[in-house]
């Protein structure tokens, strides 16, 4: 596993500059090693994303993180040194909304993945519950991931970084982005004065509001952490019926329009 990690880290450094600046944690600090047992790391030939473990067999991420080959690390903190309970899994099944507009990666940016083998709860592996209610504007939200921690030049940390941001009204994001979709099941979150944001490498990771899993890192501005440029997160609550149907075995379930 050590050799795999060394090769993976070198590849990440080689290609990470080519990733879009819509996926990083800027303005944060190293996450506590015990605060993210639900956070997973997706790696594919130098490309990487975050994921969220929602039960022993299923993870959620962004649809635009989909790749042909994916290795999923659970129980991970430092990419260079494995935790004792760290495990690797692969997708057994992948589900993207069948009614998604595939020409628009912002549309229905959610993917449900069934792991090839279930994981067991341990010190650094445990699922987080799906939301029972949507979050309220003003909520304090936590973002986390292995994305770049500097702008405009990218610097990728060995360990995940965390930052607190705020859930703001959708009108802020609609005013900030000219191409904001007319129908968007997203959450708008950030720090209006700038300085903290998600961006390159954090796509697919969780948005935790008041301790509840509410969003999936989706997209944002070309340059991260700019004033009045919050990022967009897929609103997990709106997709609960689809998620629950797929897990229950209804593989033809569709997402809300």
From Swiss-Prot:
EC number(s) on file: 3.4.21.-
Positions of glycan attachment: 101, 121, 153, 169, 210, 250
Entries under CDD domains matching the protein: Tryp_SPc (cd00190)
Pfam families for the chain: Trypsin
Entry keyword set: Disulfide bond, Glycoprotein, Hemostasis impairing toxin, Hydrolase, Protease, Secreted, Serine protease, Signal, Toxin, Zymogen
Top-tier EC class: hydrolase
Signal peptide, first to last residue: 1-18
Active-site feature positions: 64, 109, 203
GO biological process, one term: proteolysis
Gene Ontology terms, MF aspect: serine-type endopeptidase activity; toxin activity
Feature type site, description Required for specificity: 197
Cellular component GO terms, alphabetical: extracellular region; secretory granule
Compartments reported by the entry: Secreted
Major localization class: secreted
Domain Peptidase S1: 25-248
Propeptide: 19-24
Disulfide-bond pairs as recorded: 31-162, 49-65, 97-255, 141-209, 173-188, 199-224
Recorded superkingdom: Eukaryota
Summary of the tissues where the protein is detected: Expressed by the venom gland.
Family per similarity comment: Belongs to the peptidase S1 family. Snake venom subfamily.
Subunit structure: Monomer.
Its job: Snake venom serine protease that may act in the hemostasis system of the prey.
Protein name, UniProt field: Snake venom serine protease BITS01A
Record lineage: Eukaryota, Metazoa, Chordata, Craniata, Vertebrata
């Amino acid at each position: 596993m050590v050799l795999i990690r060394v090769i993976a880290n070198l590849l990440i450094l080689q290609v990470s500059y080519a990733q879009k600046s819509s996926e990083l944690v800027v303005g944060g600090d190293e996450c506590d090693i015990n605060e993210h047992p639900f956070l997973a790391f997706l790696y594919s030939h130098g490309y990487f994303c975050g994921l969220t473990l929602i039960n022993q067999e299923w993870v959620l991420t962004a649809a635009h993180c989909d790749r042909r080959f994916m290795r999923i690390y659970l129980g991970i903190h430092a990419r260079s040194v494995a935790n004792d309970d760290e495990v690797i899994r692969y997708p057994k099944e992948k589900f993207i909304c069948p009614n998604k507009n595939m020409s628009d990666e912002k549309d229905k940016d959610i993917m449900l993945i069934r792991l090839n083998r279930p994981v067991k709860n341990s010190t650094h592996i445990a699922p987080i519950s799906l939301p029972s209610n949507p979050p309220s504007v003003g909520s304090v939200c936590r973002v986390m991931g292995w994305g770049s921690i500097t702008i405009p030049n990218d610097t990728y940390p060995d360990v995940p970084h965390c930052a607190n941001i705020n859930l703001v009204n959708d009108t802020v994001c609609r005013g900030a982005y000219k191409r904001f979709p007319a129908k968007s099941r997203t959450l708008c979150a950030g720090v209006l004065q700038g300085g903290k944001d998600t961006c390159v490498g954090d796509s697919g990771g969780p948005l935790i509001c008041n301790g509840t899993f509410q969003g999936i890192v989706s997209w944002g501005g070309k340059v991260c952490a700019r004033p009045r440029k919050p990022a967009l997160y897929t609103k997990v609550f709106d997709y609960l019926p689809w998620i629950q149907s797929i897990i229950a075995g209804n593989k033809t379930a569709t997402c809300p329009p």
